[in-house]
Swiss-Prot record:
The record marks 8, 66, 149 as: Important for substrate specificity. This is dTTP/UTP pyrophosphatase. It comes from the Bacteria. HAMAP family: Maf. Its cofactor is a divalent metal cation. GO terms for molecular function: dTTP diphosphatase activity; UTP diphosphatase activity. Its EC number is 3.6.1.9. GO terms for cellular component: cytoplasm. Gene3D superfamilies: 3.90.950.10. It comes from Geobacillus kaustophilus (strain HTA426). Its main location: cytoplasm. NCBIfam families: maf (TIGR00172).
Length: 186
């Protein structure tokens, strides 16, 4: 069971070739001040899993959350176009970290989690480029105000780490963790 509203996470998990269902998770996405990024994404992923697992007690439930960190500042999803502009301006010409946390609930109710980090460097962006990207609407539902798998791919100068961590689900690590935990059942 995938506890997510993200079509990107659904598409990534389909690459594993296992059947799964999707249940939207409406968990609290606030992060306590001062929470380190690796802990923050695991906390949010766990909340998503916890919001869904009681309805599916016999299922493996997977949840994930992604944040962007630049200069020690956590960048979630922008609430306004102005906020998206400010985020993209901050990322312009710089390297930032993208963290994705994954939580997995087992049928017996225990939850395990992990976090993965990928460094992304953007080219220098001008205001017109940023405004044109925001006008597409693409950045509004994405951490850090960009989707690397969309038009923002044009902004990327370099990436160090797992590309799918930036998209929203580090698939190779997730599959290894699921196998370690007994999925798929024999």
């Amino acid at each position: 069971m995938l506890a997510s509203r993200s079509p990107r996470r659904r598409q990534i998990l389909e690459l594993a070739g296992w059947p799964f269902d999707v249940q939207e998770s409406h968990a609290d996405e606030t992060i306590p001040p001062g929470t380190p990024p690796d802990e923050a994404v695991q906390l949010l992923a766990r909340r998503k899993v916890e919001a869904v697992m009681s309805s599916f007690p016999d299922a493996y439930v997977l949840g994930a959350d992604t944040i962007v960190v630049c200069d020690g500042r956590l960048l979630g999803k922008p609430r306004t176009e102005e906020e998206a502009f400010a985020m993209l301006r901050q990322l312009s010409g710089r390297t930032h970290d993208v963290w994705t946390g994954v939580a997995i609930a087992l049928p017996q109710g225990s939850i395990t989690s992990f976090a993965e980090k990928t460094a992304v460097t953007f080219w220098e962006l001008d205001d017109e480029e940023i405004a044109a990207y925001i006008a597409t609407g693409e950045p509004m539902d994405k951490a850090g105000a960009y989707g690397i798998q969309g038009r923002a791919a044009l902004f990327v100068k370099r990436i160090e780490g797992d590309y799918l961590t930036v998209v929203g689900l580090p698939l190779s690590r997730t599959v290894r963790e699921l196998r370690r935990l007994g999925w798929p059942p024999a």
